[in-house]
């Protein structure tokens, strides 16, 4: 939520600095925002900001004409103060020489604000962020240099934050700090960058340093300096080369990132399968079999991916405990050194998941991370990391990261199954075939999903039903429809639909069934009949050449595979259905309202 991009050059870049900042803002749009702004130093501090889309604000205030060698850009998601010109970032001090941008929430900021106002500081906004600019100003008044004043200000601040600050009186540095909110440094030649995440820096560099919780420092055009508790850190050893290209973070000819990322799934699955490290997978599988309790932790789509594993683990005589990240405290008294947690997060920065993992580790729980981002907070807080290799996912609604997470978890399950003496050769062959099956699924189902979207366009609600291992797929399908098409959708176990939900079913009410679990298909057909009898429009994802199709009004056939990999194939037409329904209803699926790609506040 919110986004930061700051860059400093040794000399004036060939393109105007404001244009570079504007392009950085465009890279941040996928994170979700309601306001945008920039600050540059050019014979003094210049700040331009307002509520609205990046393109609109940039044109209104002439971002592309701004010159200089150091600047900050920010997309804001309102938490304190309404989204308007005054509350948009950057914020400045009383004299208009310090500009600050901030992601997160400053706790008890009102007390600091009151203290500063008593000392004569004048506040312009309702935000918590503005406090930081005035604190630094106050300590500079006391004779401290900018960095010392910044550090002293940080000692007064509590909460989750990523901060970047520039000072027109010392314009050769960008100061930064991080606590529980993602922040990276992009390392260049003759320039350096501070940013919220990796896709934002790919136009400039692939070399990054992940700033850790509790760290602060500054960048100049030729130096990266980081401290923690007053101790300088070895930054050279922490530089990582990111295997993503700038082109991977563009639409590549598709109308939307979401559609592009749906179509990228065969490649992402192949990359993830090829990148599975047998030794690591075996370590996780053995830990799974040895654990007293197994917690599967995630939020949103990542939670649904975790459920695909949770629903089959009982076959290994393991009773999993699925944990929605924000509800981790429910099981706090149970956490023990003999337990295992599998924590899943696309970004590796989801605040609820990070907090859950930290609470578990404090009690000795071994943590396995499944994430898409190298060097993320989750990867550093975990004992073992399994990386999905989906490439950058820009669309707010997760698609390819869900299927690569499912594939990774299925590989762990297979290895545990083999450790128990089972023959998994056929499953291994299926794993290798999944990328090609995903490609065939996209080719065969896109047209049906597009036509079906026209029928859903005028509907107000829908049910997604599945039994057994099909339920997580139904849950993910319903979430996608809500996220991008703004069409109310609920997922239930198909058998549970009789206990209340069926009361809402009337003529034409869409009910989408998922037939990905071969053990429950026949029972699910009885629910199809119940819904049809009440006038529902029955839709289903079904294995090719099965008899299920005959019982449905609309059948979307996907290639046959085992229930272990079926969630990957059955979710693809549901992703496309959500996408095309959003387009039919006139919404931009890449920028769903009220949503952010990475949720970094509680």
Swiss-Prot record:
**Gene Ontology molecular function terms on file:** carbohydrate derivative binding; glutamine-fructose-6-phosphate transaminase (isomerizing) activity
Its chief place of residence is cytoplasm
Checking NCBIfam families in the record gives: glmS, PRK00331.1
Quote the catalytic activity from the record: D-fructose 6-phosphate + L-glutamine = D-glucosamine 6-phosphate + L-glutamate
Q: Can you cite a GO biological process for this protein?
A: fructose 6-phosphate metabolic process
Which keywords fit this entry according to its UniProt record?
Aminotransferase, Cytoplasm, Glutamine amidotransferase, Repeat, Transferase
Protein's job:
Catalyzes the first step in hexosamine metabolism, converting fructose-6P into glucosamine-6P using glutamine as a nitrogen source.
Please state every residue range assigned to the domain named Glutamine amidotransferase type-2: 2-222
Q: How does it assemble?
A: Homodimer.
The organism's taxonomy opens as: Archaea, Thermoproteota, Thermoprotei, Thermoproteales, Thermoproteaceae
Its name, as the record gives it, is Glutamine--fructose-6-phosphate aminotransferase [isomerizing]
């Amino acid at each position: 939520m919110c986004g930061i991009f700051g860059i400093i050059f040794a000399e004036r870049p060939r393109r105007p600095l404001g244009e570079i900042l504007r392009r950085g803002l465009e890279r941040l749009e996928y994170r979700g925002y309601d306001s945008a702004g920039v600050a540059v130093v050019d014979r003094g501090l210049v700040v331009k900001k307002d509520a609205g889309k990046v393109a609109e604000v940039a044109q209104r205030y002439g971002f592309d004409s701004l010159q200089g060698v150091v600047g900050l850009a920010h997309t804001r998601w309102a938490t304190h103060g309404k989204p308007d010109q005054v509350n948009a970032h950057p914020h400045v001090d009383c004299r208009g020489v310090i500009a600050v941008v901030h992601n997160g929430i400053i706790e008890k900021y009102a007390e600091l604000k009151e203290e500063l106002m008593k000392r004569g500081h004048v506040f312009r906004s309702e935000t918590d962020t503005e406090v930081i600019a005035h604190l630094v100003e106050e300590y500079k008044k006391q004779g401290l240099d900018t960095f010392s004043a910044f550090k002293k200000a940080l000692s007064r601040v509590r909460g989750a934050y990523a901060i970047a600050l520039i000072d027109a009186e010392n314009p050769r540095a960008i100061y930064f700090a991080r606590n529980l909110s993602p922040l990276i440094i992009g390392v260049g030649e003759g320039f350096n960058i501070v940013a919220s995440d990796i896709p934002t820096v790919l136009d400039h560099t692939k070399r990054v340093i992940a700033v850790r919780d509790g760290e602060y420092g500054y960048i100049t055009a030729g130096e990266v300096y980081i401290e923690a508790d007053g101790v300088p850190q070895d930054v050279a050893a922490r530089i990582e080369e990111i295997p993503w290209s700038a082109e991977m973070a563009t639409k590549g000819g598709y109308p939307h990132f979401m559609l592009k990322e749906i179509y990228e799934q065969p490649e992402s699955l192949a990359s993830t399968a090829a990148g599975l490290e047998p030794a690591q997978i075996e370590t996780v599988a053995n830990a799974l079999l040895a654990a007293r309790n197994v917690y599967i932790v995630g939020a949103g789509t990542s939670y649904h991916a975790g459920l695909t594993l949770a629903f089959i683990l009982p076959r290994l005589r393991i009773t999993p405990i699925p944990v929605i990240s924000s509800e981790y405290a429910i099981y706090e008294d149970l956490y023990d050194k003999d337990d295992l947690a599998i924590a899943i997060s696309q970004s590796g920065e989801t605040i609820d998941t990070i907090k859950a993992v930290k609470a578990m580790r404090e009690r000795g729980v071994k943590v396995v991370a499944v994430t898409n981002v190298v060097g993320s907070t989750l990867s550093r807080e975990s004992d073992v990391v399994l990386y999905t290799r989906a490439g950058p996912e820009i669309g707010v609604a997760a698609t390819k990261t869900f299927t690569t997470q499912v594939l990774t978890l299925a590989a762990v399950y297979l290895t545990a199954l083999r450790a128990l003496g089972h023959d998994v050769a056929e499953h291994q062959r299926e794993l290798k075939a999944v990328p090609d099956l995903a490609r065939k699924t996209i080719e065969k189902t896109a047209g049906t999903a597009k036509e079906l979207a026209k029928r859903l366009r005028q509907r107000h609600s829908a049910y997604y039903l599945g039994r057994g291992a099909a339920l997580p797929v139904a849950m993910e399908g319903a979430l996608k429809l809500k996220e991008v098409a703004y069409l109310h959708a609920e997922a239930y176990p198909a058998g549970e639909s009789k206990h209340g939900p069926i009361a809402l079913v009337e003529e034409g009410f869409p009910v989408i069934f998922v037939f990905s679990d071969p053990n429950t298909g026949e029972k699910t057909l009885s629910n199809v009949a119940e819904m049809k009898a009440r006038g529902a429009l029955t839709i289903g994802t079904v294995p090719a050449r099965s008899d299920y199709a005959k019982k449905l009004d609309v059948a979307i056939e996907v290639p046959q595979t085992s229930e272990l990999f079926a969630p990957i194939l059955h979710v693809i037409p549901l992703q496309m259905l959500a996408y095309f329904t959003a387009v039919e209803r006139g919404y931009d699926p890449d920028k769903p309202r009220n949503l952010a790609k990475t949720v970094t506040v509680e």
